Amino acid sequence: MKAYLHVASGKTFSGELAAPLEEKVSGEIVFFTGMTGYQEVLTDPSYKNQIIVFTYPLIGNYGINENDFESKRPHVEAVVVYEASREGFHYGAKYSLAEYLQHWNIPLLTHVDTRALVKEIRTAGTMMAELSLSPISAVGGVEAVFPVRAVSTRTIETYGEGGPHLVLVDFGYKKSILQSLLARGCRVTVVPHDTAPEAIDALKPDGLVLSNGPGDPKQLRHQLPAIRQLIDRYPTLAICLGHQLVALATGRIRKKLRFGHRGANQPVWDAVKQNVMMTSQNHSYVVKEGSLVGKPFDIRFINVNDGSVEGIVHRHKPILSVQYHPEAHPGPHDTGYIFDEFLQTVFKGENVYA
């Protein structure tokens, strides 16, 4: 069946539905540049309320397995590809891409000129889009949504035994972040995004992790006073959305990139190690560099492609905040040492970042 992808810039792209579309869906349209890792992308809560375009021309050739989910379900609004493999050619595959999306009633649009579509997004910027059975566009503006509430846990759960006790504040965390901490011998308590500082104090953590998540960080501005209290009390590692919240809580300014960074091959310069690391990224917002002038933060990580801020460290407090995903999945594990550096501050109670 034919369907139409209408983008807010006024253009329309047609394709064929490989997974059902009952009427229409809308969301912010973004693109992912990795050749692999589609299963992790689909189940990353950070993609909540977004329509994802995969730039690689063939997606789904190794299917969907039971081990590479980043959460219990996919969070994207729709998937757009040039070609979707009808089978998963891997011994661990349980479903094809289309079968998996059909199970969750997420539309899959194929045979789209994704090259032209991505060029339009790069030119016009990230924008709203609508996938519809009608060739007539009715794309609206950006919806006033609060996606973090939809993906954050509603209960407090603890994983692992012994080791340092960390509280992971869940703004939409990826399973791989939890696994990276458990693999290093930590005991991790996952709490809802709006857990009060007093409730976290009662858990007696040795350190704090602020997770990734979807949406505009300013939608969480009501939580900035609580975040400010927490990062003053505990060694802190902040990732992606958590990084932006640390910046906002300490008076920094965030800005939106034209089309964001989404891929498993983003080069980042580490000013401490004096080396370039390949990173996995998924974000539309960055910390504005000028807002760090005269503040007690140093820029440690810089995106090689566009010079944007990819990570900051506090000069006097054990706060390490990164825009990229050190846990990867998908992507290289070049920056896994970030977890080790964070745990050094937890064990020693001192700042070793700078």
From Swiss-Prot:
This is Carbamoyl phosphate synthase arginine-specific small chain. Residues 165-352 form the Glutamine amidotransferase type-1 domain. GO terms for biological process: 'de novo' pyrimidine nucleobase biosynthetic process; 'de novo' UMP biosynthetic process; glutamine metabolic process; L-arginine biosynthetic process. Residues 1-163 are annotated as: CPSase. One of its GO terms (molecular function) is carbamoyl-phosphate synthase (glutamine-hydrolyzing) activity. Belongs to the CarA family. Keywords: Amino-acid biosynthesis, Arginine biosynthesis, ATP-binding, Glutamine amidotransferase, Ligase, Nucleotide-binding. Signal peptide: none annotated. L-glutamine binds at residues 46, 213, 215, 241, 244, 282, 285. Composed of two chains; the small (or glutamine) chain promotes the hydrolysis of glutamine to ammonia, which is used by the large (or ammonia) chain to synthesize carbamoyl phosphate. Tetramer of heterodimers (alpha,beta)4. Small subunit of the glutamine-dependent carbamoyl phosphate synthetase (CPSase). CPSase catalyzes the formation of carbamoyl phosphate from the ammonia moiety of glutamine, carbonate, and phosphate donated by ATP, constituting the first step of the biosynthetic pathway leading to arginine and/or urea. The small subunit (glutamine amidotransferase) binds and cleaves glutamine to supply the large subunit with the substrate ammonia. Gene3D superfamilies: 3.40.50.880, Carbamoyl-phosphate synthase small subunit, N-terminal domain. Its EC number is 6.3.5.5. Pathway: Amino-acid biosynthesis; L-arginine biosynthesis; carbamoyl phosphate from bicarbonate: step 1/1. It is an enzyme of class 6 (ligase). The gene is carA. PANTHER family: CARBAMOYL-PHOSPHATE SYNTHASE SMALL CHAIN (PTHR43418:SF7), MULTIFUNCTIONAL TRYPTOPHAN BIOSYNTHESIS PROTEIN-RELATED (PTHR43418). It catalyses: hydrogencarbonate + L-glutamine + 2 ATP + H2O = carbamoyl phosphate + L-glutamate + 2 ADP + phosphate + 2 H(+). Thermostable up to 63 degrees Celsius. The active site is at residues 240, 325, 327.
